[in-house]
Each structure stands twice: as structure tokens, then as C-alpha cells.
């Protein structure tokens, strides 16, 4: 297909007469832009669209087992990760380790997200079989370890409000997410609930997707969601360099750890 017109709202495609593999099934194809995942699912269900991608885990059950729809699930090269800024309260490595150990990522993937996600052990997803998922996770889910790390670090609940504090300041930080992907707010709320169990007050800050990269580059976050394709070209080097290449002398502001 070739592009006839392209706007923010939709793209119109026409059959390419010179396509190498012969005639294509449709003379024209319209691709509307539907950012909200719930609206996307409703449009598919009502027949307003014939095909949709990235149906949220809460809506996928509407189409599975329904003869009117064909559901295809594939192992994605996409990864969801939380970027932790090493400034402020999260600049403490024991606090960071406690945060990670307090999060039940397997439960999020299997139950909350209905098996549409796989817990990861490394930045590269298991769909790219480099063997990273066989590595031992030093910060595996263990809320008792989280409590111990925080206690060793001097955090106590001195006023009985359920939130730890030190030097008169509560253990609190923001988690920045966007909601155009249905799973991200669900994930953030689950993290928030798990952290509260170990005495951490995590507040969710929802922003427009278009602000995410800017906030990441400027370091304007405590913890920030990223949902990104790891191998746009079949090679993960761009993804790894973008997030983990050193930020010495400000050469890579996406790396909040320096």
C-alpha cells in the first residue's frame, strides 16, 4: 500500500499497483488513530473498525472465544520498565533495592495483566533469546527483604501512620505514567499498593505521553514508566545505548543514573 493522505487523526492508504507479490485484498485502507485503549476495544466490538492492535488485558477477554473475531498474540520485542532517578530519596541504593524487591512482578503479569505480559529479569525481553532471563535476580520479590533493607537504612514509622520516615521526612516519591496504554495505570496502581505494604508512599502522577521523553531527558521524575521496542532494527544496541550509555558530561540525559 502507498500513503494517500496522513493526518494526526488518520492515514489513508491505496493499493500499490507495483507491489511485487501481486494484487492485494483491498483497494483502500483507512487507519484511524485511537489513542485510548478502551475506545479502541469498543470500536472493534461495535464494528467501527475491522482490526485493532494493543487491546488492553482488561478487554482481550471480550474477543477471545468469540467466533466473530480472530485474536493473534505474539511475543513482543517491547519492554515495560520503570526508570529510577538516582536523586532525592531514590538516590539511596538500599531504598532502590527495597522498592524493587517489594514489587510482585510475576503477579502483575499473570493475574493483573491476565498473562499478556512476562516478568523480565533483564532489559532485553525473553522474546530475544540471549539467555538473560535465566540470570538470578538479586532483587526478586521479597517484601521482608525490603523491610529489612529499609530498617537497616534508618527508616522507621515514628508516628504510626503506616509510612516510614527518617529525619522527620516521610519515605515518599512520585511515579510518572501515561494512560494511552491500558496496562500502565494498572501496573502503577499495583506497585503503589505493594509499596504501601512495606511503608513506602508512592504517588502516581499521570501525564500526556508526549511529555514522557522530555521529562526523562530533563530528569524531572523520581520514577518514570517506559514502554519501548527494544530492537527496532533487529539489534538491541540502540535501545541499550539510549538508556544505559554513560551520562558523563551530559552526553546521554536519558540515563538518570549518571
Where are these regions (language model features)?
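Extracytoplasmic/peripheral linker and loop segments enriched in polar/acidic and small residues
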Residues: 109, 148, 201-212, 239-258
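Ligand-site clamp/hinge motif
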Residues: 9, 16-62, 189, 201-203, ...
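Structural transition elements
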Residues: 119-158, 179-186
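Bilobed "Venus flytrap"/periplasmic-binding protein-like clamshell domains
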Residues: 1-20, 143, 177-191
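Immediate post-signal peptide segment of exported/extracytoplasmic ligand-binding proteins
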Residues: 23-27, 93, 140-174
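A bilobed periplasmic-binding-protein/Venus flytrap-type ligand-binding module shared by bacterial periplasmic
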Residues: 14-19, 76-98, 102, 111, ...
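Ligand/substrate-recognition segments at binding pockets and active sites
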Residues: 156-231
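Ligand-binding "clamshell"
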Residues: 61-73, 219-220, 235-255
Amino acid at each position: 500500500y502507498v500513503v494517500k493522505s496522513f493526518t494526526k487523526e488518520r492515514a489513508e492508504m491505496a493499493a500499490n499497483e507495483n507491489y511485487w507479490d501481486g494484487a492485494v485484498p483491498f483497494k483502500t485502507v483507512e487507519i484511524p488513530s485511537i489513542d485510548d485503549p478502551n475506545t479502541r476495544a469498543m470500536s472493534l466490538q461495535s464494528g467501527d473498525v475491522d482490526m485493532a492492535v494493543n487491546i488492553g488485558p482488561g478487554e482481550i477477554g471480550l474477543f477471545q472465544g468469540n467466533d466473530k473475531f480472530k485474536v493473534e498474540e505474539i511475543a513482543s520485542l517491547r519492554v515495560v520498565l520503570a526508570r529510577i532517578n538516582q536523586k532525592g530519596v531514590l538516590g539511596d541504593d538500599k531504598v532502590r533495592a527495597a522498592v524493587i524487591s517489594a514489587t510482585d512482578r510475576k503477579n502483575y503479569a499473570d493475574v493483573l495483566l491476565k498473562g499478556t505480559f512476562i516478568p523480565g529479569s533483564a532489559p532485553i525481553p525473553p522474546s530475544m533469546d540471549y539467555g538473560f532471563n535465566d540470570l538470578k535476580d538479586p532483587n526478586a520479590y521479597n517484601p521482608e527483604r525490603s523491610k529489612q533493607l529499609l530498617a537497616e537504612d534508618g527508616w522507621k514509622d515514628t508516628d504510626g501512620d503506616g509510612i516510614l520516615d527518617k529525619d522527620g521526612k516521610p519515605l515518599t516519591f512520585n511515579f510518572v505514567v501515561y494512560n494511552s496504554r491500558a496496562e500502565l495505570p494498572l501496573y502503577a496502581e499495583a506497585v503503589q499498593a505493594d509499596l504501601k505494604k512495606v511503608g513506602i508512599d508512592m504517588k502516581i502522577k499521570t501525564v500526556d505521553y508526549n511529555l514522557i521523553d522530555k521529562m526523562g531527558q530533563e530528569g524531572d521524575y523520581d520514577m518514570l514508566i517506559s514502554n519501548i521496542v527494544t530492537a527496532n532494527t533487529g539489534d538491541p544496541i540502540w535501545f541499550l545505548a539510549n538508556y544505559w550509555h554513560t551520562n558523563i558530561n551530559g552526553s546521554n540525559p536519558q540515563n538518570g543514573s549518571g
